[in-house]
Amino acid sequence: MTVTLRPATLHDVPLLQAWDLLPHVIACTTDDPTATTAFEGTDWAEEIAAASGVSYHLIAEVDGRPIGAMQIIDPQLEPTHYWGDVEPNLRALDIWIGETDALGHGYGTQMMTQVIDDAFADPSVTAIIIDPLNSNTDAHRFYQRLGFRVIGRRTFDDDDCLVHRLDRADWEASRR
């Protein structure tokens, strides 16, 4: 089955809030064993309403059923400066599969491939960065299978992350 990506809308807020309560989503967003919600209680209505070319969310669907989400940001320009000082012309991604029964079917690979292709369709984008938790070794393997390479550990807020990077040249070489 093929994944379709579409812009997130305010109609998706209840779904995103529900996914935030699922243990597998929480486990990918924090190492805090007492956490009861993913993404530190993000206000999804505010996030979606603030969508721009600098930061926006997509919903992944299979046969019209939402199964996951992605966030795409320009880490140099986004207002929270989560990534700190970074070079220009990067994109940063977050991905999560919300529906438990959609895990392990290759949908994440389809989601990432579509978004990576879209990011590199902009000739100014030189690389994509991503920050899985250092403890999330499944995510490390997933990103490395897509061609991302480890840059190193970094703490974001209170999270110990292992930053990965995919350079345009490496992606293009893998697509030949």
What do the PLM-derived regions correspond to, one by one?
Residues 109-110, 134-152:
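Conserved active-site alpha-helix within GNAT-family acetyltransferase domains
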Residues 119-131:
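Conserved GNAT acetyl-CoA-binding A-motif
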Residues 102, 106-115:
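Conserved acetyl-CoA pyrophosphate-binding loop and the N-cap/start of the following alpha-helix
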Residues 129-140, 156-160:
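Conserved beta-strand-loop-alpha-helix junction that forms the acyl-donor binding cleft
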Residues 39-102, 118, 168-170:
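Acetyl-CoA-dependent GNAT
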